[in-house]
Curated annotation (Swiss-Prot):
Its EC number is 7.1.1.-. It is found in: Plastid, Chloroplast thylakoid membrane. NDH shuttles electrons from NAD(P)H:plastoquinone, via FMN and iron-sulfur (Fe-S) centers, to quinones in the photosynthetic chain and possibly in a chloroplast respiratory chain. The immediate electron acceptor for the enzyme in this species is believed to be plastoquinone. Couples the redox reaction to proton translocation, and thus conserves the redox energy in a proton gradient. It is an enzyme of class 7 (translocase). HAMAP family: NDH1_NuoN_1. This is NAD(P)H-quinone oxidoreductase subunit 2 A, chloroplastic. It catalyses: a plastoquinone + NADH + (n+1) H(+)(in) = a plastoquinol + NAD(+) + n H(+)(out); a plastoquinone + NADPH + (n+1) H(+)(in) = a plastoquinol + NADP(+) + n H(+)(out). The chain crosses the membrane at residues 24-44, 59-79, 99-119, 124-144, 149-169, 183-203, 229-249, 295-315, 323-343, 347-367, 395-415, 418-438, 484-504. It comes from Amborella trichopoda. The gene is ndhB1.
Length: 510
């Protein structure tokens, strides 16, 4: 009898929870329509995978790419709508969040064509790969709109778990297993530290979890200058630091870049930076509004260490992927300048603009590695010598992306850095901008060294790897070239017409 009553209560409670969830989705579903498109794409992928054979593999790419493009389209149609808070205050929709969601979707859309040849050469399970990519994208999108501490923790964990699985996707590769282990351990440690900071923030604000309510709670409890807030700031900075991977929280980055499959590295190198930057802007700018001087100082230290260590260590690298890992550490130092400046002096606008250019420059560079690596079996920088003689398009496209990463005029990277540094200078960050300028010059050296190898070879000799280099089959080659063309155009032409891009970025402030 008791069991029967308990069973009835369980059914009633489950029914109430389901009806509440259905009610929320019915009346608030339009606020997450782009995310719903991705969820539908995930379900469709699972259904087709369970009922199809290997001949339907092209459909998997088509469904994934189409769902991403449709999600981007839904975001564009929602542009300039009034900011809204939905799902009982857990999710916020505004232009500032949507621009980060757009960047994450753009990264994923460009990464899928890059992965076609690699998946076919290594015979990776295509469905699981695409499912993890779409789920990670979904987690990043929810993170951009997260408005409370619980969602801010769950969304990046969704992204991180998929990242761990993707980095260890080639289970037979010892380096991939090692990279996954380091990534998982450090990611778990950073998440626990982040939650520790959230607990201090929650307690100091009187039990509030929504970001704006936390600010009001700190005012009511007079705890905004308490030691607890300092502990929360330090813990959250460390937690976000592992996501952004600035120095000294960069230890996992080179190993994960070197050991993970190249398309996975290309995906993580941009999406993780965009998602973590969106998290940093919301966390530091709202709950820690009264501690702006403290978190400015912390981020300045991280930016200086990242720009110096990242660019100096990149010079000594012999692996192309490890070099790009340290290059990304230096690049995140430039992005942090925009976070410090904030919405005053167009800091966020310059950060968003530079991040858009960084996506195209970085993915364009990784397109070369995805093309060259599986066909030659090497990742050594010296083995790229003389690539221009066998594949001029790939070599020239890579050279343009590398020059743009270094900030050579008139490419997009130059104007992106120029505007970012100018905003930092106007905000009084003279020392930080000076370090950025000097380290940018250092980065040009190792980028030009690679370009010289690509064009002329080492001692004007072509390596055996390049000599045996063969172009890939038509379909996979076209998919990589498509992404490469988009990345090259985005790395060059937008630099000439910066004003419209800056204006759009300025229109996103919350």
């Amino acid at each position: 009898m008791i069991w029967h009553v308990q069973n009835e209560n369980f059914i009633l409670d489950s029914t109430r929870i389901f009806m509440k969830a259905f009610h929320l989705l019915l009346f608030h579903g339009s606020f997450i329509f782009p995310e719903c498109i991705l969820i539908f794409g995930l379900i469709l992928l699972l259904m087709i995978d369970s009922t199809s054979d290997q001949k339907d593999r092209p459909w998997f790419y088509f469904i994934s790419s189409t769902s991403l493009v449709m999600s981007i389209t839904a975001l564009l149609f929602r542009w300039r709508e009034e900011p809204m808070i939905s799902f009982s205050g857990n999710f916020q929709t505004n232009n500032f969040n949507e621009i980060f969601q757009f960047l994450i979707l753009l990264c994923s859309t460009l990464c899928i064509p890059l992965s076609v040849e690699y998946i076919e050469c290594t015979e990776m399970a295509i469905t699981e790969f695409l499912l993890f990519v779409l789920t990670a994208t979904l987690g990043g999108m929810f993170l951009c709109g997260a408005n409370d501490l619980i969602t801010i923790f769950v969304a990046p964990e969704c992204f991180s778990l998929c990242s761990y699985l993707l980095s260890g996707y080639t289970k037979r590769d010892v380096r991939s297993n090692e990279a996954t282990t380091k990534y998982l351990l450090m990611g778990g440690a950073s998440s626990s530290i982040l939650v520790h900071g959230f607990s201090w923030l929650y307690g100091s604000s009187g039990g509030e979890i929504e970001l704006q309510e936390i600010v009001n709670g700190l005012i009511n409890t007079q705890m905004y200058n308490s030691p607890g807030i300092s502990i929360a700031l330090l813990s959250i900075t460390v937690g976000i630091g592992f996501k952004l991977s600035p120095a000294p929280f960069h230890q996992w980055t080179p190993d994960v870049y070197e050991g993970s499959p190249t398309p996975v590295v290309a995906f993580l190198s941009v999406t993780s930076k965009v998602a973590a930057s969106a998290l940093a802007t919301r966390i530091f700018d709202i709950p820690f509004y009264f501690s702006s001087n403290e978190w400015h100082l912390l981020l300045e230290i991280l930016a200086i260490l990242s720009m110096i260590l990242g660019n100096l260590i990149a010079i000594t690298q012999t692996s192309m992927k490890r070099m790009l890992a340290y290059s990304s550490i230096g690049q995140i130092g430039y992005v942090i300048i925009g976070i410090i400046v904030g919405d005053s002096n167009d800091g966020y606008a310059s950060m968003i603009t530079y991040m858009l250019f960084y996506i195209s420059m970085n993915l364009g560079t990784f397109a070369r590695i995805v093309s060259f690596g599986p066909r030659t079996g090497t990742d050594n920088i010296r083995d790229y010598a003389g690539l221009y003689t066998k594949d001029p398009f790939l070599a020239l496209s890579s050279a343009l992306c590398l020059l743009s990463l270094g900030g050579i005029p008139p490419l997009a990277g130059f104007f992106g850095k120029l505007h970012l540094f100018w905003c930092g200078w106007q905000a009084g960050l003279y020392f930080l901008v000076s370090i950025g300028l000097l380290t940018s010059v250092v980065s040009i050296y190792y980028y030009l060294k690679i370009i010289k190898l690509l064009m002329t070879g080492r001692n004007k000799e072509i390596t055996p790897h390049v000599r045996n280099y063969r172009r890939s089959p038509l379909r996979s080659n076209n998919s990589i070239e498509l992404s490469m063309i988009v990345c090259v155009i985005a790395s060059t032409i937008p630099g000439i017409s910066m004003n419209p891009i800056i204006a759009i970025a300025q229109d996103t402030f919350f």
